Protein backbone atom coordinates (compact mmCIF):
# COMPACT_ATOMS: atom_id res chain seq x y z
CA UNK A 1 0.00 0.00 0.00
CA UNK A 2 0.94 3.67 0.05
CA UNK A 3 3.03 5.23 2.77
CA UNK A 4 1.45 4.97 6.22
CA UNK A 5 0.71 8.50 7.41
CA UNK A 6 0.79 9.85 10.96
CA UNK A 7 -2.70 11.29 11.34
CA UNK A 8 -4.40 13.51 13.90
CA UNK A 9 -8.18 13.08 13.74
CA UNK A 10 -10.52 15.87 14.86
CA UNK A 11 -14.28 15.30 14.99
CA UNK A 12 -17.23 15.05 17.33
CA UNK A 13 -20.58 13.46 16.23
CA UNK A 14 -21.44 10.00 14.89
CA UNK A 15 -20.78 11.20 11.32
CA UNK A 16 -17.18 11.87 12.33
CA UNK A 17 -16.86 8.61 14.28
CA UNK A 18 -17.65 6.64 11.12
CA UNK A 19 -14.71 8.33 9.41
CA UNK A 20 -12.40 7.60 12.33
CA UNK A 21 -13.46 3.95 12.22
CA UNK A 22 -12.56 3.78 8.52
CA UNK A 23 -9.19 5.42 9.20
CA UNK A 24 -8.38 2.86 11.87
CA UNK A 25 -9.00 0.07 9.35
CA UNK A 26 -6.92 1.70 6.62
CA UNK A 27 -3.40 0.99 7.82
CA UNK A 28 -2.61 4.60 8.70
CA UNK A 29 -1.31 5.56 12.14
CA UNK A 30 -3.80 7.68 14.11
CA UNK A 31 -1.54 9.35 16.68
CA UNK A 32 -4.14 11.46 18.48
CA UNK A 33 -7.83 12.36 18.49
CA UNK A 34 -9.30 15.79 19.19
CA UNK A 35 -12.98 16.09 20.04
CA UNK A 36 -15.22 18.56 21.83
CA UNK A 37 -15.53 18.48 25.64
CA UNK A 38 -18.16 16.22 27.20
CA UNK A 39 -21.58 17.91 27.18
CA UNK A 40 -24.70 17.58 29.38
CA UNK A 41 -27.31 15.41 27.65
CA UNK A 42 -30.59 13.65 28.37
CA UNK A 43 -33.13 14.42 31.07
CA UNK A 44 -30.58 14.10 33.84
CA UNK A 45 -28.16 16.45 32.05
CA UNK A 46 -25.37 14.00 32.75
CA UNK A 47 -22.05 14.76 31.08
CA UNK A 48 -21.78 12.59 27.97
CA UNK A 49 -18.73 11.92 25.80
CA UNK A 50 -18.92 12.46 22.04
CA UNK A 51 -19.23 9.41 19.74
CA UNK A 52 -15.68 10.12 18.56
CA UNK A 53 -14.34 10.05 22.12
CA UNK A 54 -16.14 6.79 22.85
CA UNK A 55 -14.61 5.11 19.79
CA UNK A 56 -11.15 6.57 20.38
CA UNK A 57 -11.06 5.35 23.98
CA UNK A 58 -12.27 1.91 22.91
CA UNK A 59 -9.28 1.75 20.57
CA UNK A 60 -6.84 3.06 23.16
CA UNK A 61 -6.06 6.29 21.31
CA UNK A 62 -4.89 9.49 23.05
CA UNK A 63 -7.87 11.88 23.33
CA UNK A 64 -7.66 15.68 23.67
CA UNK A 65 -10.70 17.85 24.45
CA UNK A 66 -9.71 21.53 24.44
CA UNK A 67 -12.47 24.13 24.57
CA UNK A 68 -10.49 26.14 22.01
CA UNK A 69 -7.37 25.74 19.88
CA UNK A 70 -6.47 29.41 20.19
CA UNK A 71 -4.37 29.17 23.40
CA UNK A 72 -0.69 28.44 22.73
CA UNK A 73 -0.64 25.48 25.12
CA UNK A 74 -3.48 23.79 23.19
CA UNK A 75 -1.75 24.39 19.87
CA UNK A 76 1.33 22.76 21.35
CA UNK A 77 -0.72 19.56 21.85
CA UNK A 78 -1.07 19.40 18.06
CA UNK A 79 2.57 20.25 17.39
CA UNK A 80 3.87 17.60 19.80
CA UNK A 81 2.11 14.81 17.84
CA UNK A 82 4.26 15.55 14.76
CA UNK A 83 1.53 14.49 12.34
CA UNK A 84 1.80 14.24 8.57
CA UNK A 85 -1.81 15.38 8.19
CA UNK A 86 -4.78 16.38 10.34
CA UNK A 87 -8.19 15.05 9.27
CA UNK A 88 -11.13 17.21 10.36
CA UNK A 89 -14.73 15.94 10.19
CA UNK A 90 -17.53 17.90 11.91
CA UNK A 91 -15.19 18.93 14.73
CA UNK A 92 -16.99 22.13 15.68
CA UNK A 93 -13.93 24.20 16.63
CA UNK A 94 -12.10 26.75 14.48
CA UNK A 95 -8.54 25.80 13.57
CA UNK A 96 -6.23 28.86 13.73
CA UNK A 97 -3.74 29.44 10.92
CA UNK A 98 -0.88 28.21 13.09
CA UNK A 99 -2.60 24.85 13.60
CA UNK A 100 -3.48 24.53 9.90
CA UNK A 101 0.21 24.84 9.06
CA UNK A 102 1.56 22.37 11.64
CA UNK A 103 1.12 19.00 9.86
CA UNK A 104 3.53 18.30 6.99
CA UNK A 105 0.64 17.90 4.51
CA UNK A 106 -1.65 20.39 6.21
CA UNK A 107 -5.23 19.78 7.35
CA UNK A 108 -7.99 18.23 5.27
CA UNK A 109 -11.73 18.36 5.84
CA UNK A 110 -14.65 16.15 4.79
CA UNK A 111 -17.59 18.41 3.89
CA UNK A 112 -21.14 17.19 3.25
CA UNK A 113 -21.79 18.86 -0.10
CA UNK A 114 -20.38 19.24 -3.59
CA UNK A 115 -18.40 22.41 -3.05
CA UNK A 116 -18.48 25.27 -3.78
CA UNK A 117 -22.25 24.74 -3.40
CA UNK A 118 -23.40 24.82 0.22
CA UNK A 119 -20.44 26.04 2.21
CA UNK A 120 -21.31 26.27 5.88
CA UNK A 121 -23.01 24.50 8.76
CA UNK A 122 -26.07 22.76 7.28
CA UNK A 123 -25.25 21.54 3.75
CA UNK A 124 -27.35 18.36 3.90
CA UNK A 125 -30.52 20.17 4.96
CA UNK A 126 -30.05 23.08 2.56
CA UNK A 127 -29.48 20.83 -0.46
CA UNK A 128 -32.74 19.00 0.28
CA UNK A 129 -34.74 22.16 0.88
CA UNK A 130 -33.44 23.73 -2.33
CA UNK A 131 -34.58 20.74 -4.37
CA UNK A 132 -31.08 19.80 -5.57
CA UNK A 133 -30.97 16.66 -7.73
CA UNK A 134 -27.70 15.47 -6.20
CA UNK A 135 -25.28 16.09 -3.39
CA UNK A 136 -22.16 14.39 -2.10
CA UNK A 137 -18.96 14.92 -0.17
CA UNK A 138 -15.91 17.04 -0.88
CA UNK A 139 -12.53 16.40 0.69
CA UNK A 140 -10.67 19.70 0.72
CA UNK A 141 -7.43 21.23 1.89
CA UNK A 142 -8.30 23.54 4.76
CA UNK A 143 -7.41 27.23 4.85
CA UNK A 144 -8.49 30.05 7.16
CA UNK A 145 -11.78 30.66 5.30
CA UNK A 146 -15.16 28.93 5.77
CA UNK A 147 -14.99 25.87 3.48
CA UNK A 148 -12.94 27.86 0.96
CA UNK A 149 -9.93 25.57 0.52
CA UNK A 150 -8.84 23.75 -2.61
CA UNK A 151 -10.86 20.63 -3.43
CA UNK A 152 -8.95 17.33 -3.44
CA UNK A 153 -11.66 14.75 -4.15
CA UNK A 154 -15.43 14.54 -4.66
CA UNK A 155 -18.02 11.77 -4.57
CA UNK A 156 -21.66 12.39 -5.49
CA UNK A 157 -25.01 10.70 -4.88
CA UNK A 158 -28.54 11.42 -6.10
CA UNK A 159 -31.17 12.96 -3.83
CA UNK A 160 -34.39 10.97 -4.13
CA UNK A 161 -37.97 12.15 -3.61
CA UNK A 162 -38.07 10.09 -0.39
CA UNK A 163 -34.81 11.30 1.15
CA UNK A 164 -34.82 13.08 4.49
CA UNK A 165 -31.82 14.70 6.11
CA UNK A 166 -31.54 11.51 8.15
CA UNK A 167 -31.31 9.19 5.14
CA UNK A 168 -29.02 11.58 3.26
CA UNK A 169 -26.77 11.84 6.33
CA UNK A 170 -26.40 8.05 6.29
CA UNK A 171 -25.57 8.03 2.56
CA UNK A 172 -22.88 10.68 3.00
CA UNK A 173 -21.52 8.88 6.07
CA UNK A 174 -20.83 5.96 3.69
CA UNK A 175 -19.35 8.12 0.92
CA UNK A 176 -17.18 10.30 3.15
CA UNK A 177 -14.85 7.57 4.44
CA UNK A 178 -14.40 6.23 0.88
CA UNK A 179 -13.36 9.67 -0.35
CA UNK A 180 -11.15 10.26 2.68
CA UNK A 181 -9.15 7.05 2.27
CA UNK A 182 -8.67 7.72 -1.45
CA UNK A 183 -7.51 11.28 -0.74
CA UNK A 184 -5.01 10.14 1.89
CA UNK A 185 -3.56 7.64 -0.60
CA UNK A 186 -3.14 10.43 -3.15
CA UNK A 187 -1.52 12.72 -0.58
CA UNK A 188 0.88 9.96 0.45
CA UNK A 189 1.74 9.18 -3.18
CA UNK A 190 2.03 12.81 -4.22
CA UNK A 191 -0.71 12.35 -6.85
CA UNK A 192 -3.37 14.67 -5.36
CA UNK A 193 -4.60 17.35 -7.77
CA UNK A 194 -6.00 20.33 -5.84
CA UNK A 195 -8.76 22.24 -7.62
CA UNK A 196 -9.52 25.87 -6.77
CA UNK A 197 -13.20 26.54 -5.97
CA UNK A 198 -15.14 28.66 -8.45
CA UNK A 199 -16.29 31.65 -6.39
CA UNK A 200 -19.11 32.40 -8.87
CA UNK A 201 -20.81 29.11 -7.90
CA UNK A 202 -20.72 29.58 -4.12
CA UNK A 203 -23.88 29.17 -2.02
CA UNK A 204 -24.08 29.19 1.78
CA UNK A 205 -25.76 26.65 4.04
CA UNK A 206 -26.67 28.66 7.11
CA UNK A 207 -27.23 26.98 10.46
CA UNK A 208 -30.80 25.80 11.11
CA UNK A 209 -33.08 27.17 13.81
CA UNK A 210 -36.23 25.78 15.42
CA UNK A 211 -38.14 28.92 14.50
CA UNK A 212 -37.17 28.51 10.86
CA UNK A 213 -38.80 25.07 10.93
CA UNK A 214 -42.23 26.56 11.64
CA UNK A 215 -44.36 25.93 8.56
CA UNK A 216 -45.00 29.06 6.50
CA UNK A 217 -48.18 28.34 4.56
CA UNK A 218 -47.46 31.15 2.08
CA UNK A 219 -44.75 28.96 0.53
CA UNK A 220 -45.66 26.46 -2.18
CA UNK A 221 -46.70 22.91 -1.35
CA UNK A 222 -43.59 21.62 -3.13
CA UNK A 223 -41.32 23.86 -1.05
CA UNK A 224 -43.02 22.82 2.18
CA UNK A 225 -42.80 19.12 1.38
CA UNK A 226 -39.05 19.51 0.81
CA UNK A 227 -38.74 21.56 4.00
CA UNK A 228 -40.42 18.78 5.99
CA UNK A 229 -37.92 16.23 4.64
CA UNK A 230 -34.97 18.61 5.11
CA UNK A 231 -35.81 19.25 8.78
CA UNK A 232 -36.33 15.56 9.61
CA UNK A 233 -35.00 14.41 12.09
CA UNK A 234 -33.99 17.86 13.43
CA UNK A 235 -35.32 20.41 14.17
CA UNK A 236 -38.57 18.99 12.66
CA UNK A 237 -41.10 21.12 10.80
CA UNK A 238 -43.99 22.15 13.01
CA UNK A 239 -47.29 23.98 13.11
CA UNK A 240 -48.99 25.56 16.12
CA UNK A 241 -52.45 24.22 16.98
CA UNK A 242 -54.35 25.55 20.01
CA UNK A 243 -51.14 26.94 21.46
CA UNK A 244 -49.04 23.80 21.19
CA UNK A 245 -46.47 22.77 18.59
CA UNK A 246 -47.34 19.78 16.43
CA UNK A 247 -44.45 18.27 14.47
CA UNK A 248 -44.98 17.18 10.87
CA UNK A 249 -43.04 14.05 9.92
CA UNK A 250 -44.33 13.40 6.44
CA UNK A 251 -46.44 15.11 3.79
CA UNK A 252 -47.16 14.91 0.08
CA UNK A 253 -48.02 17.42 -2.62
CA UNK A 254 -51.44 17.50 -4.26
CA UNK A 255 -50.94 19.34 -7.51
CA UNK A 256 -54.34 21.01 -7.56
CA UNK A 257 -55.02 24.73 -7.63
CA UNK A 258 -57.10 26.30 -4.87
CA UNK A 259 -58.35 29.80 -4.17
CA UNK A 260 -58.41 29.21 -0.42
CA UNK A 261 -56.15 31.34 1.75
CA UNK A 262 -52.82 29.69 2.67
CA UNK A 263 -53.21 27.59 5.82
CA UNK A 264 -56.89 26.80 5.21
CA UNK A 265 -57.87 23.21 5.98
CA UNK A 266 -59.63 21.84 2.90
CA UNK A 267 -60.23 18.20 3.83
CA UNK A 268 -59.43 15.92 6.77
CA UNK A 269 -59.93 12.22 6.11
CA UNK A 270 -58.13 8.87 6.06
CA UNK A 271 -56.07 10.03 3.07
CA UNK A 272 -54.58 12.86 5.15
CA UNK A 273 -55.13 16.46 6.17
CA UNK A 274 -55.19 18.68 3.09
CA UNK A 275 -54.10 22.28 3.61
CA UNK A 276 -54.00 25.17 1.12
CA UNK A 277 -50.58 26.74 0.56
CA UNK A 278 -49.25 29.65 -1.47
CA UNK A 279 -49.26 27.32 -4.48
CA UNK A 280 -50.96 23.93 -4.42
CA UNK A 281 -52.18 21.72 -1.59
CA UNK A 282 -50.06 20.03 1.09
CA UNK A 283 -51.36 16.71 2.38
CA UNK A 284 -50.20 16.05 5.95
CA UNK A 285 -49.64 12.32 6.46
CA UNK A 286 -47.78 11.86 9.75
CA UNK A 287 -47.83 14.22 12.75
CA UNK A 288 -46.67 14.30 16.36
CA UNK A 289 -48.48 16.34 19.03
CA UNK A 290 -46.42 17.53 22.00
CA UNK A 291 -45.74 14.70 24.44
CA UNK A 292 -46.98 12.01 22.03
CA UNK A 293 -45.44 9.66 19.51
CA UNK A 294 -45.65 10.30 15.78
CA UNK A 295 -48.89 8.99 14.31
CA UNK A 296 -50.78 8.85 11.03
CA UNK A 297 -53.18 11.65 10.15
CA UNK A 298 -56.03 9.12 10.51
CA UNK A 299 -55.02 8.24 14.08
CA UNK A 300 -54.69 11.90 15.02
CA UNK A 301 -58.11 12.66 13.56
CA UNK A 302 -59.60 9.89 15.68
CA UNK A 303 -58.50 11.72 18.84
CA UNK A 304 -58.31 15.36 17.74
CA UNK A 305 -60.75 15.87 14.88
CA UNK A 306 -61.70 19.26 16.32
CA UNK A 307 -58.23 20.51 15.38
CA UNK A 308 -58.83 19.99 11.69
CA UNK A 309 -62.27 21.32 10.81
CA UNK A 310 -62.42 22.17 7.07
CA UNK A 311 -62.53 25.93 6.63
CA UNK A 312 -60.42 26.62 9.71
CA UNK A 313 -56.91 28.02 9.22
CA UNK A 314 -53.60 26.83 10.55
CA UNK A 315 -51.26 29.73 11.32
From Swiss-Prot:
Coiled coil: none annotated. It comes from the Bacteria. Keywords: Protein biosynthesis, Transferase. Its EC number is 2.1.2.9. Belongs to the Fmt family. Composed of an N- and a C-terminal domain. The N-terminal domain carries the tetrahydrofolate (THF)-binding site and the C-terminal domain is presumably involved in positioning the Met-tRNA substrate for the formylation reaction. This is Methionyl-tRNA formyltransferase. HAMAP family: Formyl_trans. GO terms for molecular function: methionyl-tRNA formyltransferase activity. Pfam families: Formyl_trans_C, Formyl_trans_N. One of its GO terms (cellular component) is cytosol. Residues 210-315 are annotated as: C-terminal domain. It catalyses: L-methionyl-tRNA(fMet) + (6R)-10-formyltetrahydrofolate = N-formyl-L-methionyl-tRNA(fMet) + (6S)-5,6,7,8-tetrahydrofolate + H(+). InterPro entries: Fmt, Formyl_trans_C, Formyl_trans_C_sf, Formyl_transf_N, Formyl_transf_N_sf, Formyl_transferase-like_C_sf, GART_AS, Met-tRNA-FMT_C. The gene is fmt. The keyword Cytoplasm does not apply. SUPFAM superfamilies: FMT C-terminal domain-like, Formyltransferase. Attaches a formyl group to the free amino group of methionyl-tRNA(fMet). The formyl group appears to play a dual role in the initiator identity of N-formylmethionyl-tRNA by promoting its recognition by IF2 and preventing the misappropriation of this tRNA by the elongation apparatus. CDD domains: FMT_core_Met-tRNA-FMT_N, Met_tRNA_FMT_C. (6S)-5,6,7,8-tetrahydrofolate binds at residues 113-116.
